[in-house]
Amino acid sequence: RQRQMCIRDSLKLSDCGTYNMMIGAADMGTGCDTILAQMAAEVLDCEPDDIIVFGADTDASPYDSGSYASSTTYITGMATQNAALELRENIKKIGAQLLGCAASEVDFDGKEVYIINPDGADNGAVSVSLSDIATKAQVNNTIPVDVTATYSSPVSPPPYMVGMVEIELDKETGAVKILDYQAVVDCGIPVNPNLARVQTEGGIGQGIGMALYENVTYNAGGKIAENDFMQYKIPTRQDVGHINVEFETSYEPSGPFGVKSIGEIVINTPAPALAHAIYRATGVWHRTVPFTPEKILMGMADPNWHEKDLRVK
């Protein structure tokens, strides 16, 4: 049976008229604190700066299955959206009480709750400010202004990505130099294009490391050879060449604000793109990462050599 992730998100209207958001998602470089605040701000018609985010704290945060499996923006984002929608409705209910009318007769613009004028007159003629609502919420009030929403999804629509790489390959040494990497990503609607772009660039760097450098080998006694970063090679900024990222947007109806995930797809394209580029340069396919200079040289010397393991003896 497939295990579904379960995410909770809590939002609270503070007594000064700003918002506190409590999340269990850990920001591991994805920018989830910023993105989730943007989503809540969109629903509540406020600035992201008006939302104070309290990150993962196992003593206080609502439950979160974990920041993995490309789930934060897509699943935690939906919990955030639902919590913000519920809080918005509760703010309208308190505002309607102060205005002496039904909740169906008012709306909220982020700064005040106002009576909707069906005749098209000035909507702001009769209103109550958010700060007054925040004060009212603390005294003689039974409508909660701190809400928690839970979300779980049986599906996770896949993102798509195209990766294209230009390399320079030295046939004397087998060394590969990346000159240019072009990426086009469909992750739905990017909530924060800048964060999505740098996450894509970081994922491409990880994928290049997996494809060309990173490897773990053991000797016959089971001792690991790459036991520090002098032996375990990872790419630096100088090793990944020029990276250009573009987005092809699409709207995903099951995600919050049309988003899809982006976390893992960006790591997947460098290895096959580099394998194809090496094939175009040498005429030999390599199907086992990393594509080290030793493997490339052995492949050029013997086209029938099918990825013999270069293990430490």
Name each model feature, range by range:
Residues Q2-I7:
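Short, small-residue-biased leader/transition segments that mark boundaries at the very start
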Residues D15-C16, G110:
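Residue-level signal for tight coil/turn positions that link beta-strands
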Residues A26:
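Gly/Ser-rich, acidic/histidine-flanked active-site/gating loops
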Residues L11-K12:
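Extended lipid/amphipathic-ligand handling interfaces
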Residues C32-M39:
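Thiamine diphosphate
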Residues R1, M39-K313:
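C-terminal catalytic domains of large/alpha subunits in multi-subunit enzymes
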Residues T18-I23, I178-D180:
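Short, aliphatic-rich beta-strand segments
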